[in-house]
């Protein structure tokens, strides 16, 4: 039985990686998956040895504070990877962390694949040398990326964005926009939400005080309990917190 290690460093990557794992298991039902992920990968059948929620950080000060935790996690990943010896490692987004995981896997002789590689065509192009050295093949979700990576001698495939298949487009097209409804998207990182949502609430209060005919809907990330969000929101400002599974309907 083949075993892959999927390393998703962000909750958004966890969602993408879950779609990838589901597709892989349709082709190889006996495929085992271990690694780092969140609730979506867990539902897709991965045994999460490390939780992605413990890694997500925002801002330079929080990054510095989280550095010892990240280094400790990398040490544990190296130990588990050496013990379990997966057949392949699939990295998902989050280059600041996953580049270090790539070095670990490469040092152990485990082939490394990158799903949703960093946008080095936009900035810090020199990072392509890292991919040339440590990554066996890239799987891109943007159609123009393969030409860029191929030009630099990196093996690459364009596989499309799996999230597109998750959206029920015919049903979404039936939804009529609601005049005056304002959608709020504070993110999925704890510090990010704690910083942004109270400010969103202040702005919402100003709009209501001005007599605007508006309502507010906040898109809740899967890792954010509604009670946590309500504690950050002004109690005198009405708001609806939409469940994560309703996000596309709410955005439409």
Residue ranges and their predicted role:
Residues 216-218, 225-226:
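Glycine/small-residue-rich hydrophobic helix-like segments
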Residues 245-252:
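Short acidic alpha-helix that forms the nucleotide-activated donor recognition element
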């Amino acid at each position: 039985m083949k075993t892959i290690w999927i390393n998703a460093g962000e909750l958004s990557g966890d969602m993408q990686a879950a779609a990838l794992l589901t597709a892989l298991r349709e082709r190889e039902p006996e495929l085992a998956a271990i690694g780092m992920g969140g609730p979506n990968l867990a539902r897709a059948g991965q045994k999460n040895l490390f939780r992605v929620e413990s890694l997500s950080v925002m801002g330079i000060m929080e990054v510095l504070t989280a550095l010892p935790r990240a280094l400790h996690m990398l040490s544990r990943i190296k130990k588990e990877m050496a013990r379990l010896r997966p057949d392949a490692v699939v990295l998902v987004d989050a280059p600041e962390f996953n580049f270090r995981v790539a070095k670990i896997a490469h040092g152990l002789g485990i082939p490394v694949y990158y799903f949703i590689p960093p946008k080095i065509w936009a900035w810090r192009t020199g990072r392509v040398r890292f991919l040339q050295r440590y990554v066996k093949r890239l799987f891109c979700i943007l159609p123009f990326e393969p030409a860029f990576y191929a030009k630099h001698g990196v093996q690459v495939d364009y596989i499309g964005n799996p999230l597109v298949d998750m959206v029920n487009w015919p049903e979404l097209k039936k939804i009529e926009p609601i005049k005056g409804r304002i959608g709020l998207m504070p993110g999925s990182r704890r510090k990010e939400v704690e910083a942004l949502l109270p400010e969103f609430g202040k702005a919402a209060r100003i709009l209501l005080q001005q007599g605007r005919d508006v309502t507010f809907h906040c898109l809740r990330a899967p890792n954010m309990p509604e009670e946590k969000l309500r504690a950050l929101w002004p109690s005198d400002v009405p708001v609806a917190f939409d469940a994560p599974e309703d996000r596309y309907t709410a955005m439409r």
